[in-house]
């Protein structure tokens, strides 16, 4: 069984301890959609934590658009 934590409406500092971890998340635009988006938590060029989507290289999800996130340990 994989361990994970769930955070609702995360701020970038909530993601800081998990840089490099795999995560699944829901968008604030689609709160009823299951965890359909996934990627790894990284830092952008300004040092802000975000999720780099694994399905699309150019998609970055910043904390302002994440409704809920599961971070796998």
Predicted stretch roles:
Residues 4, 67-73:
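Mixed-charge, Lys/Arg-enriched low-complexity segments
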Residues 1-17:
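Mixed-charge, Lys/Arg-rich low-complexity intrinsically disordered regions
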Residues 15-66:
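Acidic, low-complexity, intrinsically disordered interaction modules
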């Amino acid at each position: 069984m994989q361990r994970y934590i769930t955070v609702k409406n995360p701020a970038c500092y909530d993601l800081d301890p998990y840089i490099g971890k795999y995560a699944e998340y829901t968008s604030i635009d689609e709160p009823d959609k299951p965890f359909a988006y996934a990627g790894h938590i990284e830092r952008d060029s300004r040092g802000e934590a975000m999720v780099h989507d694994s399905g699309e290289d150019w998609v970055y999800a910043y904390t302002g658009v994440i409704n809920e996130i599961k971070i796998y340990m």
